[in-house]
Amino acid sequence: MPNWGGGNKCGACGRTVYHAEEVQCDGRSFHRCCFLCMVCRKNLDSTTVAIHDAEVYCKSCYGKKYGPKGYGYGQGAGTLNMDRGERLGIKPESTPSPHRPTTNPNTSKFAQKFGGAEKCSRCGDSVYAAEKVIGAGKPWHKNCFRCAKCGKSLESTTLTEKEGEIYCKGCYAKNFGPKGFGYGQGAGALVHAQ
C-alpha cells in the first residue's frame, strides 16, 4: 500500500510519524512521546539512549539489564549497591507492556494530541523547544538546568539524579555518597592526628 505523503512508521507504536514530531534513532523513526526507555519509561534523547536488539533503553536501565553484574559494579557515588533492577521491573524473562501511557504531564487532551508544551521539572512553567534541555529523562529550561544544592549550571553529561532532582557530581557525592571512616576529603582524609 503506498504511503501518500505520509511519514515513516513509528518504531514503538507503528503509526505514521510526521517530520515535526520525528526523532530518529538507529535508522528508525519515533514520535517524541514514544521515544521512551523500554523499562522505566523515561523520555530519551541522543545523550541518554542505549540500543540492544532494536530496543531502546536509558543508559541506567541498559547498564542494569545488560552490563556487568556483581559486587562493586556501579555508576559513581554509592557503587557498592547490589540493586539488580528489581524495583524497575527488570526480570530475566520480562516482556514489555503493550500499553504505552503518555509521559506528557500536560493533562489537556488537546495538548497531548497536538503537542502542547511540556512542563519544566524545576519551575513547572511551559518549556518550548528553543529553551528546552533534557536531563535525567525530563524537560528543563536552560536557566533551571542547575544543581539543586549549589546552583552550578549543568550539562546532560555532568549531572546525577536522585528522587527527581538533579545535582552536580560534587554535591551528589557530598550529600548522598558513602559516609564513614575512609571516605574523606582527598589526600589528607586518613591522617592520624595525636
Swiss-Prot record:
The record, for InterPro entries, names: Znf_LIM
For this UniProt record, the keywords arranged alphabetically read as follows:
Developmental protein, Differentiation, LIM domain, Metal-binding, Nucleus, Repeat, Zinc
- Record's PROSITE patterns? LIM_DOMAIN_1, LIM_DOMAIN_2
Q: Does the UniProt entry include the keyword Cell division?
A: no
Gene3D superfamilies for the chain: Cysteine Rich Protein
Query: Biological process GO annotation list?
Result: cell differentiation
What SMART domains does the database record attribute to this sequence? LIM
GO cellular component terms given for this protein: nucleus
Task: Kindly list the residue ranges recorded as spanning the membrane.
Answer: none
Q: Does the keyword DNA repair apply?
A: no
Where's it mainly located?
nucleus
- Report motif location: Nuclear localization signal: 64-69
Domain (LIM zinc-binding) spans 10-61, 120-171
Question: What subcellular locations does the record give?
Answer: Nucleus
Q: Which GO terms describe its molecular function?
A: metal ion binding
Name the job this protein performs.
Totally down-regulated in transformed cells. May therefore take part in the control of cell growth and differentiation.
Name this polypeptide is given: Cysteine and glycine-rich protein 2
- Could you tell me which species this protein originates from? Gallus gallus (Chicken)
Q: What gene makes this protein?
A: CSRP2
